[in-house]
Amino acid sequence: MAAADQAGEVIGVELNRAAVRDAISSAKANGVKNIRFMAGDAGEFLEDMAARGERADVVFMDPPRAGSTEKFMDSVAKMGAGRVVYVSCNPETLARDLKYLKKKGFVAEGAWVVDMFPWTESIETVCLLKSNK
């Protein structure tokens, strides 16, 4: 939702239906009108978009601790996203996924560590990737 004021349209795709309901409620409560959410597999959603010739300028991805899937990352590359914002809670899977995305034509432009859980060992890392295609 934070990107909605910078975009013509924002689409959120999430497997967890309760999270989708919460996101819809939050968008309504905050008066965000150029956003829609759907429950489903984000990789399949991106594949369908690419098959229809649609593209996204920016893809935000926040995979589980196990990291992303090659299917999802292939879909990101296929649809021609110019930038990817990758949020990760696991530095090991982040490194693995960045290596894969590099093979798909993305380069890391910057990375930021966010201490969302003070006094714990947990961190979030946000990486900005740019397509070199």
List each model region and its residues.
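Rossmann-like S-adenosyl-L-methionine
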Residues: 1-133
